[in-house]
Amino acid sequence: MKQQEPLETSFANRIAHVLTEALPYIRRFKGRTIVVKYGGNAMIDDHLKNSFARDVVLLKLVGINPVVVHGGGPQIGNLLQRLGKTSEFVQGMRVTDAETMDVVEMVLGGLVNKEIVNLINRQGGAAVGLSGKDGDLIRARKIRMSQPLSDAPEIIDLGHVGEVASIDPAVVDMLVNGDFIPVIAPIGVGEDGCSYNINADLVAGKMAEVLKAEKLILLTNTQGILGRDGALLTGLSLKEVDALIEDGTISGGMIPKVRCAMDALRGGVNSAHIIDGRIDHAVLLELFTDQGIGTLLLRR
């Protein structure tokens, strides 16, 4: 009879420690909703994609309700380039004419969304892909941007770029209650019936607020919020975040992410996390370990 080789004691002890450390967090979050904004390198690297899918499935299996909102900017840019269409950006936002919006819907609502659904389902989950147009989930409002000039501001038409006007969570609630994992593409529909591309961070934040989520998790390509010395700031209050924005410590592309998280907290979400999606099993490490791996934001 072939005998199984015994696990090395130190390795077995580490496994036991990880499981016991996770137990109180699993107990605390059971039955709660956690909204995860999925983007950055975690969507590009094959190993990280599978790691993320396993994390989401595990959350569901232990009784937590994950809701995934995803981006897809690089994928949109790649397809536009292949089609010979140049992307124009104004203050970080892609100018989106009707033809570009067709590509955005094709990439976000089709290619990217269905790839994520397939990844989760292959890991044993039951994911269902949605865009904000399904079940009238996301109502959008066209963004109108002004650019300061010497005399009067210039009004810039970004085309089919929107913000969240309202969210009707009925279809998401139905899926969660049916033990499915919703995967949402950030496309909304306006009062004019047109489709609008919406920043995925904003959609995730509003979704967390409307669903009365326990947590909002934003996956990024950085460790989290960094101090002036480059060290990770592991925990911040809203007041502390305001001060860091004011003194320039938080700057650039991190500001809209942080503001989105702050709005979610003010809207009733218990905590928000900005974490490094380049780390294997980042979601589990942030949720189920005492130390975490990113920046935890709290209302206090």
From Swiss-Prot:
GO CC, any one term: cytoplasm
Principal subcellular localization: cytoplasm
Single Gene Ontology MF annotation: ATP binding
GO biological process: arginine biosynthetic process via ornithine; L-arginine biosynthetic process
Top EC group: transferase
Binding site for substrate: G72, G73, R94, N197
Pathway: Amino-acid biosynthesis; L-arginine biosynthesis; N(2)-acetyl-L-ornithine from L-glutamate: step 2/4
Pfam family, one: AA_kinase
Domain of life: Bacteria
EC number: 2.7.2.8
Keyword terms: Amino-acid biosynthesis, Arginine biosynthesis, ATP-binding, Cytoplasm, Kinase, Nucleotide-binding, Transferase
InterPro entries linked to this entry: AceGlu_kinase-like_sf (IPR036393), AcgluKinase_fam (IPR004662), ArgB (IPR037528), Asp/Glu/Uridylate_kinase (IPR001048), Glu/AcGlu_kinase (IPR001057), NAGK-C (IPR041727)
Subcellular compartments: Cytoplasm
Family the UniProt entry places it in: Belongs to the acetylglutamate kinase family. ArgB subfamily.
Described function: Catalyzes the ATP-dependent phosphorylation of N-acetyl-L-glutamate.
NCBIfam families found in the cross-reference section: argB
Name of this chain's protein: Acetylglutamate kinase
Annotated source species: Methylococcus capsulatus (strain ATCC 33009 / NCIMB 11132 / Bath)
Gene this chain is encoded by: argB
